[in-house]
């Protein structure tokens, strides 16, 4: 059987101890024995960005080639400050569209195809109005997308978030002008917190097939959850230490139907240290033996 495509969130900054910018991102992933990676192109909480020609793209490509990492499996995460589901504040929506266009351009420059985006929050607006604002926003950025596909992330339902249900994503995909430019990222913690029970992964797969279709799943965020089913909290837990459990996450990772889809760990650091090397080893060996805490 094929080996899963498994990596984690890694840094992408001048000060990464593994190396500057994209060089450090790949070297950090390799230190975890990962075969893919996810990074932000700048801080997730602000709009300050280093020009892409300073990110060592050529060296990045060379490192990927030398280490047999398929660039098509690499994921970029859009910053949290984009909210194109906001139906009540035009300024916020306009900023989100403009900044998302910039992020798309940066992904095009780097050559990464998968851009994960949080759908956003409705604030005081109506839920359907928020989904329509999201559709409008995705239509507004579509002309910027040449190779990049936006993968909307499933959300936990914290506050006024939209995108809790696979039906939300079906609605968006059905209504955008260019559906081929929109896909989905399944976050296991968020889905669990929104009410999807990973004790029955087969049932979740049926729901995927009935709504968005499995071809629309571009990546997974593989996380355990600190909270029980339907908690709407969004607090990630280390693999095997939460309410989803090691065996259930193993089923997702090794599922033959999704074996070629990248899975990304976003689990918490333990005592300021990344747990990813141990978590990847446990998941690949199908053995919960390396304790991270």
UniProtKB/Swiss-Prot annotation:
It is an enzyme of class 3 (hydrolase). The keyword RNA-binding does not apply. It catalyses: Endonucleolytic cleavage to 5'-phosphooligonucleotide end-products. Zn(2+) 3 binds at residues 190, 234, 236. SUPFAM superfamilies: Xylose isomerase-like. Binds 3 Zn(2+) ions. Its cofactor is Zn(2+). InterPro entries: AP_endonuc_2 (IPR001719), AP_endonuc_F2_Zn_BS (IPR018246), Xyl_isomerase-like_sf (IPR036237), Xyl_isomerase-like_TIM-brl (IPR013022). GO terms for biological process: base-excision repair. Its EC number is 3.1.21.2. It holds the Pfam family AP_endonuc_2. Zn(2+) 2 binds at residues 153, 187, 221, 266. Keywords: DNA damage, DNA repair, Endonuclease, Hydrolase, Metal-binding, Nuclease, Zinc. Zn(2+) 1 binds at residues 77, 118, 153. PROSITE patterns: AP_NUCLEASE_F2_2, AP_NUCLEASE_F2_4. One of its GO terms (molecular function) is phosphoric diester hydrolase activity. Endonuclease IV plays a role in DNA repair. It cleaves phosphodiester bonds at apurinic or apyrimidinic (AP) sites, generating a 3'-hydroxyl group and a 5'-terminal sugar phosphate. Belongs to the AP endonuclease 2 family. This is Probable endonuclease 4. The gene is nfo.
């Amino acid at each position: 059987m094929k080996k899963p495509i498994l990596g984690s969130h890694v840094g992408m900054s001048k000060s990464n101890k593994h190396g500057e910018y994209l060089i450090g991102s790949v070297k950090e992933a390799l230190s975890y024995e990962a075969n893919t990676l996810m990074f932000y192109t700048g801080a997730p909480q602000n709009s300050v960005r280093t020009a892409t020609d300073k990110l060592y793209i050529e060296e990045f490509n060379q490192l990927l080639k030398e280490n047999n990492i398929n660039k098509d499996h690499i994921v970029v995460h859009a910053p949290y400050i984009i909210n194109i589901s906001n139906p009540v504040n035009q300024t916020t929506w306009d900023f989100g569209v403009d900044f998302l266009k910039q992020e798309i351009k940066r992904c095009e420059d780097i050559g990464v195809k998968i851009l994960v985006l949080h759908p956003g929050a409705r604030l005081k607006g109506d839920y359907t109005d928020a989904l329509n604002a999201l559709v409008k926003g995705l239509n507004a950025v579509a002309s910027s997308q040449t190779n990049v596909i936006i993968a909307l992330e499933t959300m936990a339902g914290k506050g006024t978030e939209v995108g809790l249900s696979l039906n939300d994503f079906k609605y968006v995909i059905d209504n955008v002008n260019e559906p081929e430019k929109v896909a989905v990222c399944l976050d296991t913690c968020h889905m669990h917190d929104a009410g999807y029970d990973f004790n029955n992964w087969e049932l979740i797969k049926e729901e995927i097939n009935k709504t968005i279709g499995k071809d629309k799943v571009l990546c997974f965020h593989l996380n355990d959850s600190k909270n029980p089913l339907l908690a709407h909290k969004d607090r990630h837990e280390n693999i095997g230490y939460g309410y989803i459990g090691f065996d259930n996450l193993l089923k997702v990772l090794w599922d033959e139907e999704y074996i070629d889809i990248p899975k990304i760990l976003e689990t918490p650091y333990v005592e300021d240290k990344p747990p990813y090397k141990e978590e990847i080893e446990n998941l690949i060996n199908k053995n919960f033996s390396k304790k991270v805490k």
